[in-house]
Amino acid sequence: MNLLQLGKLHENVLDAGCEPNRNARYLASLGYKVVGIDISERAISKAIDKTSSEKSNVNFNQRDFSRLNEFKGHFDTVIDIGCFHSILNSDHEPYTASLSHICHSDSSVFLRAFSETNKSRYRRWQGHKRYSLALKRNNVKKLSL
């Protein structure tokens, strides 16, 4: 994971769209406090089953991505690997608005989504621009695409 090598991850991590939960479990094994969320009940059940025999610092929650403001406290790091471009376009703004509630001024949000470089393969490549603009409108200051 390059973010680790670059020292970009900080103590409290949210893994948005955590299936198949490898990142959440790996970061927890390194001592990070991790919350993995997914809208899929099946994905969360599988994640809980996988970690039930492990001693880890990860908590999995089924969660509507537009209701992250229900979390108490803030996250230092948010990792979104495939969540944003998997939700409906109409949910992009509520999702990014909810991120602003769980991020503090020094939080970092890392997004892996479709980009201009692969637009011939994917029709929704413009999503990264909407995400970036929505995050900025909602006062999330640090964004890496």
Curated annotation (Swiss-Prot):
GO terms for biological process: methylation. Probable methyltransferase. This is Uncharacterized methyltransferase C750.03c. Belongs to the methyltransferase superfamily. The keyword Transferase applies. Keywords: Methyltransferase, Transferase. Its EC number is 2.1.1.-. GO terms for molecular function: methyltransferase activity. It holds the Pfam family Methyltransf_25. It comes from Schizosaccharomyces pombe (strain 972 / ATCC 24843). The keyword Methyltransferase applies. CDD domains: AdoMet_MTases (cd02440). It comes from the Eukaryota.
